[in-house]
């Protein structure tokens, strides 16, 4: 098999543009009295598995794509063996490189009729073996996409016909609520333990809060409270930022001045007067708020706003505990420790003195803590003889000598075993110590709540009554 160049067909006779590539026909070496049967589809259309128009002067697809339209010998009928086909393919490639193909021919009418009626060569698996390397080169040149087939038809705005782009599949639902004023978009937060190393303003601003973050005001539950999951948070979950906090030793807080700035909404001079000098990271928040609100109505999430969000989140956390029916004393004591630790951090910054909103929310949180203690002590009272547990664990399998209620099982120091009376006394001490912490918080909140009668008085009475009940029962 070899390339046999034939004469050009005049463009005027074929009525084709002069820019079209010449047609090549592949036929075997030597003369044969039997007429040659050609494929009904050119090699380009056959390799791309598309319908070929079948013009011997060049099919429509090759003319549109400026390809060289080549028709091969039809392999219908008796074919040579595997070894002969392999040798013939190598010889065909060598002769094609030595003898350039620059001419085309028009077959007679009889052979043309045979080409158009012959359809079996399209599905013949042996027909591509003779020209394996030729078809491989054509496959590399054949475009598969719509943009590559018709580059002039595509426009810059027609990027994709699919409305759901690949990147859109990974957009979280909270990101669809476009809110540039959301403080969660300007501060990074995660449910992992915070790293107290310093961060730059750029790093803090570009970090995005994941869905379900702690302080996102839009991530509020929409289902009824009993159906909400129990929030097992820790103290680090309440920190709104990872910036080190300095102690309250720089004098009284400075009152805020109204927002005013001619350029971008922020400057070094205005930042000093805008926020309190005792809250260094609140000034950072105001700077981020100015950067995100350039060109829009000023809306700042300052330190006071952040504090109210934190207090509201604490109240929500404790309400889930109450609605979830948490009565195990170990869980109640751990919840009290976590919550009071965060409340103490807020009080140390003096945030409850700047406005009554924060103080009232903290008072509600203390009331919820006392409610948890009352339910836990009532559930685990010594009079409940059929329940002997600590933290909700059944201790009936440990022995019949457990007459107390919510006691500490098998507590010892090395070989020294602590008896039941000592365990009850230890439990009483731990409960009273946690309640004394609530009394300390109420003492700090009393001056910040300008109400008469002060609601802290009634809550302190409840705490003292609960402490007396615990001491008398043990």
UniProtKB/Swiss-Prot annotation:
Keyword Transcription: yes
Residue ranges with Basic and acidic residues bias: 117-138
Disulfide feature: none
GO cellular component: nucleus
Region (Disordered): 85-148, 177-206
Gene Ontology process terms (BP): positive regulation of transcription by RNA polymerase II
Database matches in CDD domains: GAL4
GO molecular function: DNA-binding transcription factor activity, RNA polymerase II-specific; sequence-specific DNA binding; zinc ion binding
Matching Pfam families: Zn_clus (PF00172)
Compartments reported by the entry: Nucleus
Residue ranges: DNA binding: 42-69
Function: Transcription factor that specifically regulates the gene cluster that mediates the biosynthesis of aspirochlorine (or antibiotic A30641), an unusual halogenated spiro compound with distinctive antifungal properties due to selective inhibition of protein biosynthesis, and which is also active against bacteria, viruses, and murine tumor cells.
PANTHER family: THIAMINE REPRESSIBLE GENES REGULATORY PROTEIN THI5, ZN(II)2CYS6 TRANSCRIPTION FACTOR (EUROFUNG)
Designated name of the protein: C6 finger domain transcription factor aclZ
Organism: Aspergillus oryzae (strain ATCC 42149 / RIB 40)
